[in-house]
């Protein structure tokens, strides 16, 4: 296609949202009109499915739950007055609490005000808040946030060491729907011990974000924590940024949460339009379907050309891959669906993996995120008439052109600036796209059986560890790995037992190996 034809195609397929100043360009996805026409019946069903979901239909049959993250930014859509009222009241409570923390009306026992936050959560309880903090937190926030998003002891130590002199003025958010998820539970216990080590009463620093009646909720109530905010069973982790999960940490950092909600609401309105060409989420879903033949055959590479959007690809990684990565479709057929997502930022990636994107395996499509405003204020000239921002824009446009010239497809999303409204809109845009695409390929976007399988497998390993250690503590002589496995009734778990013991030995847990470490079958094991 020559330059003139491309210009016409660009104009034909350009989507523009005037209120948000957002552009979506899918002209460099090489679908034709016949392809679009062939998908229209599927889109009719997808639009109908989405309308039913927003009305409160059971959209997650595995757990018999509604899916209502859209109600968070427009409570009038909620299926009952009680849900609508709770959404409104929770937002007001979040704003009031944040103001009291920031002004010192609520303050720690040994300081005039809180200066820092430790946010403990995993998955959607971390990725959304991390993305929003990186994108929107002011340079000098009223409280500086730090995340514990894993059960890695060294990672926890790094945060606690960094904050050791500020612990007495550090607020702790514990985010867990059940309170029993191992990663946040472990983080909470370790942080509690750190506070006790400085003779600080953890309850006077702690805030719970959890389901009403959960184990965490009961602990918070019994110990008298500073506050508790709800997590709803109709909001999944990966779509929870507009709930207490995301709004509490954002508000505490001084981010305009109402503007973020308003941006999401505007995008929700735009993505309800039942016409593919006039619905940005439908255009994205169309492009994803085209690129991967409706089977996820190509990866999505996300390149935001703005440092503050660095974590957008990680956020989308969970949203897209956890929603769409499914073995079975809604009819129970094995389909192995999903779209792999990765990325970092432009133009950094042009000096990393863009070489492969341009000339290597064509197993991807690119999503370029463009921000029109370079910075707040004027930019100095680097060359005559040229600024650093001009270079960044040139690199984006150049990458887009270079990819297309070599038959590599791309999508470009353009926003006027990075602010609370546009970030809210981006989140809402991709939430809706995932839902529409899932309908196109006939899968449930709102459950995650693979995650649950991983949790159960981890529990089996920890149970195995307890049995192994218990056996070795009773035995008076060293045993081979095979003997250990036989004695605890786990003859098929020799490799797992070896790896458990190797980890314990490396962490001075009393495990002693005799034999050749390079030949595990030669080892004799005891506990000192």
Curated annotation (Swiss-Prot):
Sorted UniProt keywords: Cytoplasm, Gluconeogenesis, Glycolysis, Isomerase
Recorded catalytic activity of this chain's protein: alpha-D-glucose 6-phosphate = beta-D-fructose 6-phosphate
GO BP term, example: gluconeogenesis
Top-rank EC class of the record's enzyme: isomerase
GO molecular function, one term: carbohydrate derivative binding
E.C. number: 5.3.1.9
Pfam families: PGI
GO CC term (a single one): cytosol
Pathway where it operates: Carbohydrate biosynthesis; gluconeogenesis; Carbohydrate degradation; glycolysis; D-glyceraldehyde 3-phosphate and glycerone phosphate from D-glucose: step 2/4
Active-site residues annotated for this sequence: 322, 351, 455
Subcellular location: Cytoplasm
Annotated family: Belongs to the GPI family.
Protein name: Glucose-6-phosphate isomerase
Organism: Trichormus variabilis (strain ATCC 29413 / PCC 7937)
Name of the gene encoding the protein in the UniProt record: pgi
């Amino acid at each position: 296609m020559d330059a003139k034809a491309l210009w016409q195609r660009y104009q034909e397929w350009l989507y523009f949202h005037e209120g948000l100043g957002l552009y979506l360009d899918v002209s460099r996805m090489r679908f034709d009109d016949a392809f679009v026409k062939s998908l229209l019946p599927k889109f009719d069903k997808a639009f109908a499915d989405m309308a039913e979901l927003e009305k409160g239909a059971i959209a997650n049959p595995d757990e018999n739950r509604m899916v209502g993250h859209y109600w968070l930014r427009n409570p009038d859509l909620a299926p009952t007055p009680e849900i609508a009222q709770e959404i409104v009241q929770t937002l007001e409570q979040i704003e009031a609490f944040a103001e009291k923390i920031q002004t010192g009306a609520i303050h720690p026992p040994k300081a005039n005000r809180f200066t820092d936050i430790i946010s403990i959560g995993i998955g959607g309880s971390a990725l959304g808040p991390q993305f929003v903090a990186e994108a929107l937190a002011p340079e000098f926030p009223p409280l500086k946030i730090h995340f514990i998003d894993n059960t890695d002891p060294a990672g926890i130590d790094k945060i606690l060491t960094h904050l050791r002199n500020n612990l007495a003025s550090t607020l702790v958010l514990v985010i867990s729907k059940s309170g029993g998820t191992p990663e946040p539970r472990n983080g909470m216990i370790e942080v509690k011990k750190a506070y006790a080590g400085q003779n600080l009463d953890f309850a006077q620093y702690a805030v719970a974000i959890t389901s009403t009646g959960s184990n965490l909720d009961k602990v918070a109530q019994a110990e008298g924590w500073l506050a508790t905010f709800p997590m709803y069973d109709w909001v999944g982790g990966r779509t929870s940024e507009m709930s207490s999960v995301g709004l509490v940490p954002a508000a505490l950092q001084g981010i305009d949460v109402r503007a973020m909600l308003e941006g999401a609401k505007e995008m929700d309105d735009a993505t309800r339009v039942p016409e593919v060409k006039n619905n940005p989420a439908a255009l994205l879903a169309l492009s994803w379907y085209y690129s991967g033949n409706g089977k996820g055959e190509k990866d999505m590479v996300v390149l935001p050309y703005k440092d503050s959007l660095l974590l957008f690809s990680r956020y989308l990684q969970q949203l897209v891959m956890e929603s769409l990565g499914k073995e079975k479709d809604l009819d129970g057929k094995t389909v192995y669906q999903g779209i792999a997502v990765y990325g970092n930022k432009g133009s950094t990636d042009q000096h990393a993996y863009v070489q492969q994107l341009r000339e290597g395996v064509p197993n991807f499509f690119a999503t370029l995120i463009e921000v029109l405003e370079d910075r707040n204020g004027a930019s100095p000239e680097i060359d005559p008439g040229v600024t650093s921002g001009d270079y960044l824009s040139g690199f984006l446009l150049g990458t887009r052109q270079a990819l297309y010239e070599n038959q590599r497809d791309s999508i470009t999303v353009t926003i006027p600036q990075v602010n609370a409204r546009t970030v809210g809109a981006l989140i809402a845009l991709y939430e809706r796209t995932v839902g529409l695409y899932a309908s196109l390929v006939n899968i449930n976007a709102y459950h995650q059986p693979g995650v649950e399988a991983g949790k159960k497998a981890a529990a089996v390993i920890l149970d195995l560890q307890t049995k192994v250690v218990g056996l070795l503590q009773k035995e008076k002589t060293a045993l081979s790995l095979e003997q250990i496995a036989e004695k605890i009734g786990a003859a098929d778990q020799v490799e797992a037992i070896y790896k458990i013991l190797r980890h314990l030995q490396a962490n001075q847990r009393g495990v002693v190996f005799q034999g050749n470490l390079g030949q595990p079958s030669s080892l004799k094991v005891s506990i000192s």
